[in-house]
Amino acid sequence: MRIANTVNDSIVDGHGLRFTIFTQGCPHHCPGCHNPDTHDPAGGREVSLEELMAEMGRNPLIEGVTLSGGEPFAQAADCAALAQAAHARGLNVWTYSGYLFEHLRDSGNPDWTALLAQTDVLVDGPYVEALRDLELDFRGSSNQRVLDRAAIEALRPVEA
């Protein structure tokens, strides 16, 4: 898996204390992106699932894992495997994506389907600078949605 960075004690990337992984590579290139250094798929560094799980295990207080970016769905198979391993440790998984839920759901891409199945909360949609709102929880712009497990399992978006 190619990543830009990790944060082992985030409180801004989902509920509770989180281990956040910033994946490397993003096709969206949203103007005003908070993480433009994650766009280049050749940037960052290569890490194994075992390395990430070991790093995650160093903080016994974390409640969940957040997959951010970059675009996690650009490395969906690796992210799904990591999410499954996190669930095995009793951690919840939040995934941020510049894609809309409907696009991910309808894509027919089995790796995307696998990552959706391992995601407890999906924050979807591209960052839109004109819709930036600092008052929003866990989102940068008002077009983005926070979709919970029920919405994902029902295959229809419901604001969480």
Give the residues covered by each predicted segment.
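P-loop/Walker A phosphate-binding loop and immediately adjacent motor/lid segment at beta-alpha junctions
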Residues: 75-89, 94, 132-160
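Conserved Radical SAM active-site core
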Residues: 2-4, 17-18, 35-114
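N-terminal pre-triad scaffold of radical SAM enzymes
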Residues: 2-29
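Conserved C-terminal portion of the radical SAM core fold
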Residues: 59-66, 123-129, 153-159
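Short, conserved loop/helix-junction motifs that constitute active-site signature segments
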Residues: 113-117, 140
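Domain-level signature for proteins that mediate thiol-based redox and metal-cofactor handling
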Residues: 8-12, 50, 132, 138-139
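Well-ordered beta-strand positions
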Residues: 119-121
